[in-house]
């Protein structure tokens, strides 16, 4: 996919409207995780150092079109300033006379953060007039919010009807990484899909089963696939109503030449809590009173062996209930194997989704994979094969 980037763009003296995703975790009025801000700061810094007058806009949380003080971007603007290492101004609206005055007073290299765009109901409606008012503040539009690109809102989509639109550096990295993984990948391609429910990842499984060579199914959704094939999974979380669907996915994959890998052994317990008594058993020997809470060591060994023969890997979702010890072991072990293959065998490894990022952080391998996306819904929709409105408008 060809899209417009900041390469060669002269921004000196120009007003640049930058859409960031500043929807970050907060605790006691302070930003508790700076990852998303730090990933987007380079785009703002590059524009400011290039002499642009940078006007930042973003949503935060779900105020439903009303002004909610706890959802103000003011404290987040301060965190952005700290990440940039320069003062950042803030204005308590995103359209109107006060905002226009603040923009008119900007000098080259200044950064101004507008108030939460979702304080206006028109934002999520992609309202044309609201889009026009936002766009009227600037001469150029830059979108660096890949994680919000699956929404056709005024600040991600509507404004592009009025301004030339470019991808910021994080947006560029995200799209290029995903193109590398699923657009035109080096084969063989494998995908790991974990998580609790088949029902929430139907589109994803359907798309991947026709695009990848190897599909690894883990997490609680593996229980549903196993049960659909007549394997007794005890008291494990599973969706009985999805058995026909699971069998259909297996059949589709078979016709497409996609190899599906399911667990061959399981770590089981009779209660879901930290450090309970556990048993590791063959997948055919799960006790009636037990739950499968992680895949076993033989599954990890087989997966590591199979992945050593692929060139590209996409990962969404943990293999087990990684947030509770000891059911993190398989995810951590496989993550470390994937990191090793990335470093020594040239594996292109791209991962994303909230739980996935948390699991990879827990395993200490985020920096060792080719790319780890902090985007949740947008990453998932891209993997489902859907076009993202906020990316489509950046096409060259």
From Swiss-Prot:
<dbReference type="GO" id="GO:0005829">
    <property type="term" value="C:cytosol"/>
</dbReference>
<comment type="similarity">
    <text>Belongs to the phosphoglycerate kinase family.</text>
</comment>
<dbReference type="GO" id="GO:0043531">
    <property type="term" value="F:ADP binding"/>
</dbReference>
<feature type="binding site">
    <location>
        <begin position="59"/>
        <end position="62"/>
    </location>
    <ligand>
        <name>substrate</name>
    </ligand>
</feature>
<dbReference type="GO" id="GO:0004618">
    <property type="term" value="F:phosphoglycerate kinase activity"/>
</dbReference>
<dbReference type="InterPro" id="IPR015911">
    <property type="entry name" value="Phosphoglycerate_kinase_CS"/>
</dbReference>
<keyword id="KW-0808">Transferase</keyword>
<keyword id="KW-0963">Cytoplasm</keyword>
<feature type="binding site">
    <location>
        <begin position="21"/>
        <end position="23"/>
    </location>
    <ligand>
        <name>substrate</name>
    </ligand>
</feature>
<comment type="subunit">
    <text>Monomer.</text>
</comment>
<protein>
    <recommendedName>
        <fullName>Phosphoglycerate kinase</fullName>
        <ecNumber>2.7.2.3</ecNumber>
    </recommendedName>
</protein>
<dbReference type="GO" id="GO:0006096">
    <property type="term" value="P:glycolytic process"/>
</dbReference>
<dbReference type="InterPro" id="IPR015824">
    <property type="entry name" value="Phosphoglycerate_kinase_N"/>
</dbReference>
<feature type="binding site">
    <location>
        <position position="201"/>
    </location>
    <ligand>
        <name>ATP</name>
    </ligand>
</feature>
<keyword id="KW-0418">Kinase</keyword>
<dbReference type="InterPro" id="IPR036043">
    <property type="entry name" value="Phosphoglycerate_kinase_sf"/>
</dbReference>
<dbReference type="GO" id="GO:0006094">
    <property type="term" value="P:gluconeogenesis"/>
</dbReference>
<feature type="binding site">
    <location>
        <position position="151"/>
    </location>
    <ligand>
        <name>substrate</name>
    </ligand>
</feature>
<dbReference type="InterPro" id="IPR001576">
    <property type="entry name" value="Phosphoglycerate_kinase"/>
</dbReference>
<feature type="binding site">
    <location>
        <position position="323"/>
    </location>
    <ligand>
        <name>ATP</name>
    </ligand>
</feature>
<comment type="pathway">
    <text>Carbohydrate degradation; glycolysis; pyruvate from D-glyceraldehyde 3-phosphate: step 2/5.</text>
</comment>
<dbReference type="GO" id="GO:0005524">
    <property type="term" value="F:ATP binding"/>
</dbReference>
<keyword id="KW-0324">Glycolysis</keyword>
<dbReference type="Pfam" id="PF00162">
    <property type="entry name" value="PGK"/>
</dbReference>
<feature type="binding site">
    <location>
        <position position="36"/>
    </location>
    <ligand>
        <name>substrate</name>
    </ligand>
</feature>
<feature type="binding site">
    <location>
        <begin position="353"/>
        <end position="356"/>
    </location>
    <ligand>
        <name>ATP</name>
    </ligand>
</feature>
<keyword id="KW-0067">ATP-binding</keyword>
<keyword id="KW-0547">Nucleotide-binding</keyword>
<feature type="binding site">
    <location>
        <position position="118"/>
    </location>
    <ligand>
        <name>substrate</name>
    </ligand>
</feature>
């Amino acid at each position: 996919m060809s899209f417009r980037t900041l390469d060669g763009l002269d921004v000196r003296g120009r007003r640049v409207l930058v859409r960031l995703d500043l929807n970050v975790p907060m605790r006691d009025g302070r930003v508790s995780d700076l990852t998303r801000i730090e990933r987007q700061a380079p785009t703002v810094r590059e524009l400011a150092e290039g002499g642009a007058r940078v006007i930042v806009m973003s949503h935060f949380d779900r105020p439903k079109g009303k002004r909610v003080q706890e959802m103000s971007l003011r404290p987040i603007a301060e965190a952005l300033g700290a990440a940039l290492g320069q003062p950042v101004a803030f204005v308590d609206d995103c359209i109107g006379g006060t905002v226009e005055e603040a923009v008119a007073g900007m000098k080259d290299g200044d950064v101004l953060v507008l108030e939460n765009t979702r304080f206006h109901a028109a934002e999520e409606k992609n309202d044309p007039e609201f889009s026009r008012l936002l766009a009227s503040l600037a001469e150029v539009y830059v979108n660096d919010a890949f994680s919000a690109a699956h929404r056709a809102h005024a600040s991600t989509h509507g404004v592009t009807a009025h301004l030339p639109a470019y991808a910021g550096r994080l947006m560029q990295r995200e799209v290029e990484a995903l193109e590398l993984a699923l657009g035109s990948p080096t084969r063989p391609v494998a995908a790991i899909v974990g998580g609790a429910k088949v029902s929430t990842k139907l589109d994803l499984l359907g798309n991947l089963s026709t695009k990848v060579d190897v599909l690894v199914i883990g997490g609680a959704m593996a229980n549903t696939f196993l049960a659909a094939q007549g394997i007794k999974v005890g008291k494990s979380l599973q969706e009985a109503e999805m058995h026909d669907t699971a069998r259909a996915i297996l059949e589709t994959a078979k016709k497409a030449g996609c190899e599906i890998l399911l667990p061959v052994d399981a770590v089981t317990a009779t209660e879901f809590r930290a450090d309970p008594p556990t048993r590791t058993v063959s997948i055919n020997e799960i006790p009636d009173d037990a739950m499968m809470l992680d895949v076993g060591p033989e599954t990890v060994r087989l997966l590591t062996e199979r992945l050593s023969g692929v060139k590209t890997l996409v990962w969404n979702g943990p293999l087990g209930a990684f947030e509770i010890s000891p059911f993190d072991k398989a995810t951590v072990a496989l993550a470390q194997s994937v990191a090793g293959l990335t470093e020594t065998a040239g594996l292109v490894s791209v991962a994303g989704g909230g739980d996935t990022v948390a699991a990879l952080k827990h395993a200490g391998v985020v920096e060792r994979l080719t790319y780890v996306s902090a985007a949740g819904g947008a990453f998932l929709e891209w993997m489902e094969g859907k076009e993202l409105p906020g990316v489509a408008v950046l096409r060259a």
